[in-house]
Design a protein with these regions (language model features):
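Short hydrophobic alpha-helical runs that function as membrane-insertion/retention elements
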Residues: 5-8, 109, 140-141, 169-171
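Core domains of carbohydrate- and sulfate-ester-processing enzymes
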Residues: 41-50
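Short secondary-structure transition/capping segments
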Residues: 17-22, 120-122, 151-154, 181-183, ...
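Active-site environment of divalent metal-dependent phosphoester hydrolases
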Residues: 13-16, 113-117, 145-152, 175-179, ...
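Divalent metal-binding pocket/active-site signature
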Residues: 99-159
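Active-site neighborhoods of metal-dependent hydrolases
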Residues: 51-55, 60-87, 93-114, 159-162, ...
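Metal-associated gating/positioning segment near the N- to mid-region
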Residues: 1-37, 41-42
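Amphipathic alpha-helical segments in well-structured domains
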Residues: 48, 125, 154, 185-189
Length: 342
């Protein structure tokens, strides 16, 4: 493919700087993305400087850069607890951001759709990113919602970049859900045009295919992801809590990215499964697995997450080829992105 450079740490999910207090929790949360670390000397690193030192010791065939994940930074300070940061915690975040940039991080990545970053509101993001104010240091972002609430999600991050006067890069732009195909991309690019006219530096990338990939636990509504893996598994083991989750997932939402409602279980595939019970179903859709198990697909989802302790990645067919081609024609702003390159 002619790749010369790999930039790690996207979507707020970087392996550094994790700090030391919540290192175990962060390692567990990221394990479905980072893979099995049993044969590695280390995986999650407390500081960006330690990551850079380890990187220099590796033989690499391509250039390598690193973004400091805002999700990892926040988790290193507060764990996966809900609520706003205290003043002391905000200052800790600032210190880690500054240390990471000084150590060689290219910028800061956000994953506002993921735990724990979905705890930030718009003003909380502005506060957390204060060390970048007025600089040319880029912020890349997996926006809060790529489905029904995509316009609100884009307005949120454009507003943050505009107030801080920093460059903004939107990661893997797409419009999820058939009801959002066709007209929505036109409205999305209009937002970019309006922001650029006001002097905001904003661009985006997309991958040239129709299937995305992320953690299967991301299907759960944000309020049911709070507290980290142990708390999530406790909820999934509770039948009354399962019913509450299902009730939310069956409704459209512009507050969170409800991929279950937007794509359907037929288009959501469990791509990595490790337990004896589910290993043979890897690569199959949740709907297909549920059919073979003769159970409701919602319960299949919860059973998989519980058995695998949320360490599952998924593939989800969510985009439109016509929309993809429309975005690709926006040559002044577009770059092509290939995800999950190992």
């Amino acid at each position: 493919q002619g790749l010369t450079t790999v930039v790690n740490g996207n979507c707020g999910l970087s392996v550094a700087p994790a700090g030391e207090k919540f290192e175990k929790e962060i390692a567990g949360f990221l394990s479905s993305v980072t893979g099995d670390s049993k044969n590695r000397e280390t995986e999650i690193m407390s500081t960006m400087s330690s990551y850079m030192s380890a990187l220099q010791k590796e033989e690499r065939s391509v250039n390598t850069g690193m973004l400091a994940g805002n999700g990892t930074i926040r988790a290193g300070v507060k764990g996966y607890a809900s609520g706003k940061l205290s003043k002391e915690e905000v200052h800790q975040v600032w210190n880690v951001v500054e240390e990471s940039l000084a150590a060689g991080a290219l910028g800061i990545s956000l994953g506002i759709a993921y735990a724990p970053e979905f705890e930030y509101d718009r003003d909380g993001l502005v506060e957390a990113l204060q060390p970048l104010k007025g600089t040319d240091i880029p912020v890349t972002v997996h926006i809060r919602n790529e489905g029904d609430g995509i316009l609100l999600a884009l307005q949120e991050v454009i507003s943050v970049a505009e107030e801080l006067k920093i460059p903004l890069h939107v990661s893997h732009l797409k419009c999820i859900g058939k009801k959002n195909w066709g007209e929505m991309p036109v409205r999305v690019l209009k937002l970019f045009d309006q922001a650029a006219a006001r002097g905001v530096k904003v661009d985006f990338d997309l991958y040239p295919y129709l299937t995305g990939s992320t953690q299967l636990v991301h299907l759960l509504p944000p309020q049911f992801q709070e507290g980290g893996t142990d708390a999530i598994c406790a909820r999934l083991a509770d039948q009354s809590c399962r019913r509450k989750i299902t009730k939310v997932l069956k409704q459209p939402s512009d507050i969170f990215e409800n991929i279950v409602e937007l794509a359907g279980f037929e288009m959501i595939y469990a791509s990595t499964l490790h337990t004896e019970k589910f290993r043979s179903y890897a690569g199959q859709s949740i709907a297909k697995i549920a059919e073979q198990l003769e159970q409701d697909p919602y319960d299949t989802l919860y059973d998989i997450l519980l058995a695998e302790r949320c360490q599952v990645t998924m593939l989800d067919t969510i985009a439109s080829e016509e929309d993809m081609l429309y975005f690709l024609k926006d040559s002044p702003r577009i770059s092509i992105f290939f995800s999950w390159i190992n």
